């Protein structure tokens, strides 16, 4: 019984971690009606809710800390986003940074949008 419990615990942990790793694979939609989150790109990081670094590999896009990997298919994405022209139409305001060390949340109350 103890071995079964340990096995189920490990399988659950692996499943949970796999879900978190995939959390930042995003797809850019052509329509706001297909999107999970409407995003506006700010000119300054001080105006942003989230500073985003575009990863070159899906394996670098971990957790919910602003490391995004853009996928080619909406079926591979955890979140579908649509870029809007006005910050007033956006659910989330982001700023693209040049280093993954600069990525992260500036407004923690919006974190649930990307889970």
Language model features: what each stretch is:
Residues 4-16:
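Sec-dependent N-terminal signal peptides
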Residues 21-115:
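Repetitive, compositionally biased segments used for assembly/scaffolding
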């Amino acid at each position: 019984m103890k071995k079964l419990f340990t096995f189920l615990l490990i399988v659950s942990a692996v499943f949970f971690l796999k879900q978190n790793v995939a959390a930042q694979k995003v797809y850019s939609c052509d329509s706001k009606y297909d999107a999970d989150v409407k995003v506006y790109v700010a000119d300054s990081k001080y105006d942003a809710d989230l500073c985003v670094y575009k990863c070159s590999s899906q394996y670098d896009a971990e957790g919910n800390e602003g490391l995004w990997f853009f996928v080619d298919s909406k079926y591979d994405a955890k979140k579908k986003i649509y870029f809007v022209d006005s910050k007033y139409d956006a659910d989330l305001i982001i700023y693209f940074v040049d280093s993954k060390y600069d990525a992260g949340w500036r407004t923690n109350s919006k974190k649930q949008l990307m889970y």
